[in-house]
Regions:
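Beta-loop motif signature
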Residues: 181-221
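Intrinsically disordered, low-complexity, charged/polar segments
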Residues: 168-173, 234-253
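...with weaker cross-activation on analogous glycine-rich loops/strands in unrelated enzymes
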Residues: 2-10, 59, 71, 79-154, ...
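Residues that flank catalytic or metal-binding motifs in active/ligand-binding sites
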Residues: 118, 125-127, 133, 210-215, ...
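N-terminal capping segments
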Residues: 1-82, 125-127, 138-140, 146
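Short capping motifs at secondary-structure boundaries
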Residues: 73-81, 194-196, 221-225, 229-234
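Basic/aromatic-rich interaction segments and small domains that mediate binding to polyanionic partners
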Residues: 206-243
Length: 253
């Protein structure tokens, strides 16, 4: 049985592949044979628009829907060229159930999102995703990028794309453990929450900047320096941080 932390890492790894929302598909590569199969397996996929999308996809694109993404990982999906990308149907004691049945199998189901745990299922009628931490959810949806993607948990944070969910709970097919404390290190990608940075680790004059996605490039005398972490915005980030910042002013991405 996967731990919630392993489960989330495997889900996040799917975003590195080409994916497409295909109803009833749990990680199959969209080969010619699979395109033939999945354009006929469900009314949703039979619409001219979806047929065109599926047929246009390259053979190294993997098909998922919201519940099938979760089942695929729990069934051992590996991103291979085998029939189901390495997943074994109904393996590991995980049944083939839909989104609405999946939330019914969960424990600790609640509509209060203030203390949601990494790896919990998030649900709204007919749709599911998984909370991955830092106010983010991984889901497969035809909205936005039309595949597996990371979105903002709109119940507790703002971001784009964003969605508000109804309920969340712990899946019975995942072992939930406490997350190990994170020790920031050089090279880590973080979300900077502050609005200022400094020219040196002990500078007294702050300069305005915009927070956002950044990389830790240096750590100077932690526990002694006023601003021990040096951050530089990542390529494509809206952040403007490029300087020294305080401990506790950022979170792991």
């Amino acid at each position: 049985m996967l731990t919630n932390l392993q489960f989330v890492e495997k889900l996040k790894s799917v975003t590195k592949y080409k994916t497409l929302y295909v109803m009833g598909c749990f990680g199959a590569p969209l080969t010619a044979a699979n395109k033939e199969r999945y354009t006929k397996n469900h009314a949703y996929n039979k619409s001219p628009e979806r047929v065109a999308m599926i047929n246009k996809a390259s053979a190294d694109t993997f098909g998922f829907d919201c519940a099938c993404l979760i089942k695929a990982i729990l069934w051992g999906w590996k991103g291979t060229s085998s029939t189901y990308g390495g997943a074994v149907y109904m393996s590991n004691g995980v049944p083939d159930i839909n989104a609405d049945t999946m939330i019914q199998q969960c424990s600790g189901v609640t509509s209060n999102f203030s203390s949601i745990t990494i790896g919990e299922l998030v649900w709204l009628p007919g749709h599911v995703g998984v909370y991955i931490g830092n106010n983010k959810v991984i889901e497969c949806t035809p909205s936005w990028s039309n595949g597996v993607q990371i979105t903002t948990l709109g119940n507790v944070a703002k971001g784009s794309p964003s969605r508000e969910w109804r309920l969340h709970g712990k899946l019975p097919y995942v072992k939930y453990i406490a997350e190990s404390p994170w020790t920031p290190k050089v090279g880590d990608i973080v979300t900077y929450k502050g609005k200022v940075h400094y020219a040196s680790a002990n500078a007294t004059t702050a300069h305005s900047c915009t927070g956002g996605k950044a990389r830790i490039t240096h750590i100077h005398q932690l526990g002694k320096s006023k601003h021990p972490y040096h951050l530089v915005k990542t390529t494509g980030s809206s952040s403007t941080v490029h300087g020294w910042v305080d401990e506790g002013s950022f979170t792991k991405l």
